[in-house]
A protein has these predicted regions:
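Acidic, surface-exposed loops and disordered segments
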Residues: 1-169
Length: 169
């Protein structure tokens, strides 16, 4: 359906795995996070929570925990300056996981719509099951049964995407 801006945006978004050392503008981050909250949720509960990590120290700490969960000594966030971590709360609605995934999807698509590159990074659950991860949750004021669902890295790509997109459909 050529000519439809929403469809074109969905079809042209790519995962970016190399980032320039350049912060994302505040107004773009706010627009991305706001759009993410418009995802549909079970029973309209709107229970997922997003924590935006921009501090290099905290970002590097979460990246190290993620790399440890992966069993590699690498930066799983590919140098991205910001990470939006999406959490679901197990006690609010039975669809907490699906709801958090929809929020992450909205977040990634909103980033593309405002010209910010992104990538979905796994292992949020494993990171926030560790003692260090639970300490971060407490520091961020997230008490209760919050589960990490998605790390959405945000920034500006350092070069063209290597991912050509979907073919053969």
């Amino acid at each position: 359906m050529s000519g439809n801006a929403v469809i074109e945006s969905l079809e042209t978004r790519r995962a970016v795995r190399s980032y320039a050392d350049r912060p994302v503008e505040r107004e773009k981050l706010e627009a991305i996070l706001e759009a993410a909250t418009y995802a549909p949720t079970g029973m309209g509960a709107q229970s997922p929570v997003i924590v935006l990590v921009e501090s290099k120290e905290t970002r590097d700490k979460v990246a190290a925990l993620n790399a440890g969960a992966m069993g590699r000594d690498t930066d799983p966030f590919y140098g991205a300056p910001a990470v939006a971590i999406v959490f679901g709360h197990k006690d609010v609605v039975p669809t907490w996981f699906e709801d958090a995934c929809l929020v992450a999807g909205n977040l990634l698509n909103a980033a593309h719509a405002v010209g910010v590159d992104s990538c979905f990074i796994y292992r949020a659950k494993e990171v926030f099951e560790t003692d260090e991860g639970r300490a971060l949750l407490k520091e961020w004021g997230l008490d209760g049964d919050y589960v990490g669902v998605a790390n959405c890295i945000l920034g500006y790509g350092d070069g063209p995407s290597r991912n050509p997109g979907k073919t053969g459909t």
